Amino acid sequence: MLSFMKIRRNPTRPVTIGSITIGDGHPIAVQSMTATKTQNIDATVEQAEALHARGAGVVRIAVDSDKDAEALAEIRKQTQANLAVDLQENFRLAEKVAPHVDKIRYNPGHLYHHARELTWQEKVRYLIDTAGSNNCAVRIGVNCGSVDPAKKEKYDHDDSITPMLESALEHCELVDSLGFHNFVVSLKDSDPSKVVQVNTLFAEKRPDVALHLGVTEAGMPPDGIIKTRIAFEQLIGKGIGDTVRVSLTLPNPRKPEEIDAGKQIVEDIHAGRVRSVVKFDDSKLNIISCPSCSRVENEAFIDLAAKVKEMTTFAQEYSITIAVMGCRVNGPGETDDADLGLWCGPAKVNLKRGPEALGAFGYDEILPKLKQELDDLIAAKQ
């Protein structure tokens, strides 16, 4: 955690996450997420401890199965880090992991895949009851690539802000009505300007709710750090934000660099070293890529993201977005809005043009296919 020069902060409610408290004027906590396979207990403990030692206030771990939950119980015994669990579709795993973590993160857009006979309100009640009985904080994590489908259908396809905002506010209202207040909200997009917009709107309507800031799929450094800095400087500079994560596409041994980047940005803001006069140029090539986590099924994803960046330098002057995602959980949905999208499986990389699937190709075949599609896009723009 960081505490430097006094800056104005929104009067958010305090949220206790293990040994730290965020909100209510407490120092902004920097956090990260393990990228090792959760069932590889030794590797996950090693990475959690490395992040904790570097200054992570919270370390998040993905759990997608009963075996992951069993591994998490052992991981808890071997690390001093404050642990958050990342639940995707299988909300019922909350009961198995809650005794071993300090925070539960759920995504409102992922509550529709399991137990469809239950309403989303019933599922949230279950999550909140479980968190409360185990003294866990909760993060309501709204993401641009997996927004509540009922909310997306109400608005124009180009309006990604309103569905996210409505979903977050609706979930806050329900959780408050259940008498639970130890929660934080995140609203993330890969476009830093949208991150600023949606978090500003949320803070205007719910200045009492603590906010976790982040630019999702920010990509590789230094670009990913620049995108994140643009959003953080504008938000934290006006009092918005209680905890942050810098999501970077990095090899596993370099994950602690996310903590370094987050601490540096927050320290610079506190010291008045603001650089947002350098704006993110969305009229040029934009490559977004996820920061990797335990759901990545082939670590060649990291190398592929770097090769895509290198191969596409010739297209820098074109307004084209290419998304490179590491798993089948988030990849299919979070590449829909890109001009060209790649999401990686264990042996194949799935290529898309917008929401249209173009096929699955080997890791050694995908770059020529991507180059062909990119050439076609550029030709169409000329």
Curated annotation (Swiss-Prot):
Residues reported in the UniProt entry to bind [4Fe-4S] cluster: 290, 293, 327, 334
GO molecular function, one term: 4-hydroxy-3-methylbut-2-enyl-diphosphate synthase activity (flavodoxin)
Pathway given in the UniProt record: Isoprenoid biosynthesis; isopentenyl diphosphate biosynthesis via DXP pathway; isopentenyl diphosphate from 1-deoxy-D-xylulose 5-phosphate: step 5/6
Top-level taxon: Bacteria
EC nos: 1.17.7.3
UniProt remark on cofactor binding: Binds 1 [4Fe-4S] cluster.
Cofactors that this protein relies on: [4Fe-4S] cluster
Keywords, in A-Z order: 4Fe-4S, Iron, Iron-sulfur, Isoprene biosynthesis, Metal-binding, Oxidoreductase
Pfam families linked to this entry: GcpE
Reaction(s) this enzyme catalyzes, per UniProt: (2E)-4-hydroxy-3-methylbut-2-enyl diphosphate + oxidized [flavodoxin] + H2O + 2 H(+) = 2-C-methyl-D-erythritol 2,4-cyclic diphosphate + reduced [flavodoxin]
Any single GO BP term: terpenoid biosynthetic process
Family: Belongs to the IspG family.
HAMAP family documented for this protein: IspG
Function of the protein: Converts 2C-methyl-D-erythritol 2,4-cyclodiphosphate (ME-2,4cPP) into 1-hydroxy-2-methyl-2-(E)-butenyl 4-diphosphate.
Protein name according to UniProt: 4-hydroxy-3-methylbut-2-en-1-yl diphosphate synthase (flavodoxin)
Source species: Rhodopirellula baltica (strain DSM 10527 / NCIMB 13988 / SH1)
Gene: ispG
